[in-house]
Amino acid sequence: MVEASNTKGTQKDGILATLEWQEDVAVVTIRRPQRRNAVNHATLMLLQEFQEEARGRARVLVLTGEGEGFCAGADLTGVEDEEFGSALSATLLGFTLLPCITLAAVHGYALGAGTQLAVACDLRVATPSSVFGIPAAKLGLAVDQWTIERVARECGGAIARNMLLGTSTYSGEQLHTQGAVHKLGVLSDALEWAHYLATLAPITIAAHKRGLEAVAEKIVNDAAFEALRAQAWASADAHEGRTAFLEKRKARFTGN
């Protein structure tokens, strides 16, 4: 595994999160283990900053948490702040809008905002014993419509209803059986997969990702998708992919 070449974090309120680079894989780690990686407004703003750094440079972004869990939810000392809700929504949407693959590496608790962050990512690797759930109804809170639609789409309607209405939790193994977790494993497994994914054609990935989001948004003939699709077909990577196939060798994609 390639060593991190660069690390960036913040000292405000202690280190809240870091961004490490392993070649063209960005590894974003929430670092509030004393709060079980519960996110506050400052953490969310930092995640948004990292999203922008990853845009145009990363082929894969891996999101994980330090210590014993992925993210135990929102830091309840500030969740009532209207700015927090706006920051959370922007952060979740930000992961879906990145052109690169986003991959959540989940262990321990992924509750509330933790589950929201996980389902906002394109792919999920989780340990069998990791715990997913949205216990908002136990707190008298309500998640936004985007989250409800995303959880229903990624986890299935029945599981979404049980999470949101019954406040039930699911293990990583249970969600893997249902297809909501794509692979069972630990962070090293997620990073190994990420480095493989980073070898795929980035323009194609961006087009397919936009197309998947357009399907989710029920957009037909989405102009942004069609533009990316045309770019993929006309790209040097497309020529390289076809040439490598004919020459029976591994393609070397440059993102051009």
What are these regions, as identified by a protein language model?
Residues 73-74, 151, 159-168:
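Short helix- or helix-capping micro-motifs
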Residues 123, 162, 166-168, 174, ...:
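Well-ordered beta-strand positions
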